[in-house]
Amino acid sequence: MKKIARAVHLWIGLLFGTILVVLGLTGSALSWMHELDKILNPGLLQVVAPHGLYPGDSMRVAPALVQSVADMLVRDPRYGQPNTLGLPARAGDVFVATYRSSPGHVEAPWTQAVTRHVMVDPATLRVTGERNWGELGLSRAMLMPTLFHIHRYLVAGEMGKVVVAITGASLLLTILSGLILWWPRMARSTIWKALTVRHGGSWPRFCYQLHRTGGFLVAPVLFVMALSGVYFTMPQWVTPVVNAISPVTPKNKSVNHGGGPAEHILVGAAITAAQQRFPNGRVTRVSFPPKGVDPFEVRMRQPAELRQGPGATRISIDSGNARVLGVVDPQQARGGDKFLSWLFPLHTGEAFGLAGRIFISLFGFVPLAFFTTGLVTWLKLHRGRSVAYKNRVEYRQIERA
């Protein structure tokens, strides 16, 4: 068993180790993505706070203001109706309108899709700037989006997302094989040896012990990071497994029940309907219906939600009569739905507040540490075997002489 586990552990490390290092390091930076993005791009993402509020204060945006921003964009021939509109969460933030590629445009599987982001000042309705989300670059405006697309897509579109999912699945196998290799005999001395790290005057020995003991100690966190990463990129791989253990509610697309293309409510009415359903929630994003018969999709964050930022509450609003068609409420989730709703807050660390985010940002260096210590250990063993093989060959040549 250990021989097979050793081979699996070795080859996964050699094949996917570099990708895991890249994902870990980019994840460390993305733990503070929005904060760093604002620091790098103050003119694009920060404006003067509304009267009576200090920069950074939490704020709720009135439906009338959302309607005013949407109307301004529709009237301007440079923009038109956006696909989604992100609302400012704090005083000093901007609206972010997104425009996806035209419906007829087809991206190659390895091509990174590009979305146009337009930022709007809530107070003046002035466009502060725009950028193409998905384009790569190291400029101040493109640095954080580039890191995001490396982390999620390896800058290779849908094909890169599959590679990331396979890498996450390989990490799960690495954890399992590593635990098999770590497992000591049930004796006090061997258990203590498996749980301690000593230098002993040898760096290769230190690297081996650090790799072995450290791997055991961080295995639970690595497991959560790997499983959640696979779920974010390929949910169809994870959801059936979770559903087999605990029921997961099927995701059915909502359809308007009343009215037609000619009868269409405004976005402000959709926001009002969502706020009436969750009076204490804060609207964070609204998706506009691409066709007249499709509903609005409003995203909110409720006060007690684990997920920070945009939250995970979703409300489908009939675009013909403003009735609520469907609700996804993470605070009422049960079983498999509850488990899946926990994955993102655990992956980012925000489930445990600021301390959790700091921990995850530091944890992003763990793959680099394991790749380095594992490589040092393997090279030492490989070199030792090569020398032993060379000595055996020379000995046989001497015997024949």
Model feature map: region roles:
Residues 1-401:
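Conserved histidines in hydrophobic membrane contexts and catalytic metal-binding motifs
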